[in-house]
Amino acid sequence: MMKPERKTHPLLMIINNSLIDLPTPSNISYLWNYGSLLGITLVFQIMTGIMLAMHYSDNMDLAFSSMIHISRDVNYGWMIRFFHGNGASFFFICLYVHIGRSIYYNSYKLNYTWNIGIIILLLTMATAFLGYVLPWGQMSFWGATVITNLLSAIPYIGMTIVNWLWGGFAVSNATLTRFFSLHFLLPFIISAMVMIHLLFLHQTGSNNPLGLNSNTDKIPFHQYFSIKDLITMMLFIMILSFLVLFSPNILGDPENYIPANPLVTPIHIQPEWYFLFAYAILRSIPNKLGGVIALLMSIMILFFLPIFSKNCFSTSFNKWSGMIFWSFINIIILLTWIGANPVEAPYIIFGQILSVLYFLTFFWMPYSMVLFQKIIELL
């Protein structure tokens, strides 16, 4: 009997094994849909980004004007711009939910997949920061100045690295040009890393809500989960479209509608909302080098989760770990709120307390899992 073309053609076989006949645990929930949402959003961001790059000028005298030109003169330019800007926010929402689900259901036990995922997170954060600088408004300019200047905290070579990054002794035309080039390049590197992420995932198979081996209970990805993914994609597009068409600036900063002026400092310099939790941790350390280390460790600590926790139980079965996890989510939300506020009392002390709790959570959760397992064994 003749096999279908998708099972014999060398290229179609790759798509077939990844999207059609992929053996998938039958009990995965909607929380497993965020991976496909991230893939669609990445493609969407690359497409809108290329269209914006066709009309953008990477010159400090023309960058702000080119953004106004895109919004006013280019056919549907305002829509492309707002879809790209708000699409980045939605990308990070999906990314954080995806990571949160992996922590909650112990998916970080798939070491290679998890580590590549964290590298993708770091690359995405770098891409988003570079993109935030491109409109060349007040917050773009001062955000670039403040955040890149943090590298000067590195002993001996810090200031040299900063000058090399800036292309001079201050944020200038050279800085904007290289930031634009890197912002254009990084999404394609992220796409390659996503392929590696999927390669490792399909080697081991996906995790499931029970946290158990599901080799005896798997079904094809298509049509069961492909339809399920399409429903969430439709909801995602509807919500994003509603935001873009009715409140496109709700997630942005009004300061960025003022052209960059190196002589006037904004009252409160802050990054985009999806970096505010890490920014609050940075500000909570009075020492500059200590703050930079804390900022890096707020993300890098995710690499150590598989080392900290060797437990086989999913957090969904462990009420103590569950309470710690949801407390951790509240800590991140509060840190985001504190990062959006000025550096003054009582935000300083609250930020310091929450930063300590943020890092302690990564030690409490594995310990609670071990304790819970010992109690189960005793019973």
From Swiss-Prot:
Q: Which CDD domains would you find in this protein's record?
A: cytochrome_b_C, Cytochrome_b_N
The molecular function terms of the Gene Ontology recorded here are: metal ion binding; ubiquinol-cytochrome-c reductase activity
Record-annotated membrane-spanning stretches: 34-54, 78-100, 113-133, 179-199, 225-245, 289-309, 320-340, 345-365
Domain of life, per lineage: Eukaryota
Q: Which PROSITE patterns match?
A: CYTB_CTER, CYTB_NTER
Show the GO cellular component annotation of the record: mitochondrial inner membrane; respiratory chain complex III
Give the UniProt subcellular location, in the record's own words.
Answer: Mitochondrion inner membrane
Q: Which UniProt keywords apply?
A: Electron transport, Heme, Iron, Membrane, Metal-binding, Mitochondrion, Mitochondrion inner membrane, Respiratory chain, Transmembrane, Transmembrane helix, Transport, Ubiquinone
> Which InterPro entries did the record assign?
Cyt_b/b6_C, Cyt_b/b6_C_sf, Cyt_b/b6_N, Cytb/b6-like_sf, Cytochrome_b, Cytochrome_b_C_euk/bac, Cytochrome_b_N_euk/bac, Di-haem_cyt_TM
Any Gene Ontology biological process: mitochondrial electron transport, ubiquinol to cytochrome c
Quick one: which residues bind heme b b566?
A: 98, 197
Per the entry, which co-factors are needed?
heme b
Q: How does it sit in the membrane?
A: Multi-pass membrane protein
Main location per UniProt?
A: mitochondrion
Extract the Pfam families matched here: Cytochrom_B_C, Cytochrome_B
Which residues does the record give as a ubiquinone binding sites? Answer: 202
What's noted on cofactor binding?
Binds 2 heme b groups non-covalently.
Q: Where does heme b b562 bind?
A: 84, 183
Name the SUPFAM superfamilies for this protein: a domain/subunit of cytochrome bc1 complex (Ubiquinol-cytochrome c reductase) (SSF81648), Transmembrane di-heme cytochromes (SSF81342)
- Entry similarity comment: Belongs to the cytochrome b family.
What's this protein's function?
Component of the ubiquinol-cytochrome c reductase complex (complex III or cytochrome b-c1 complex) that is part of the mitochondrial respiratory chain. The b-c1 complex mediates electron transfer from ubiquinol to cytochrome c. Contributes to the generation of a proton gradient across the mitochondrial membrane that is then used for ATP synthesis.
PANTHER family registered for this protein in UniProt: CYTOCHROME B
Instruction: Please describe the quaternary structure of this protein.
Output: The main subunits of complex b-c1 are: cytochrome b, cytochrome c1 and the Rieske protein.
Q: What is this protein called?
A: Cytochrome b
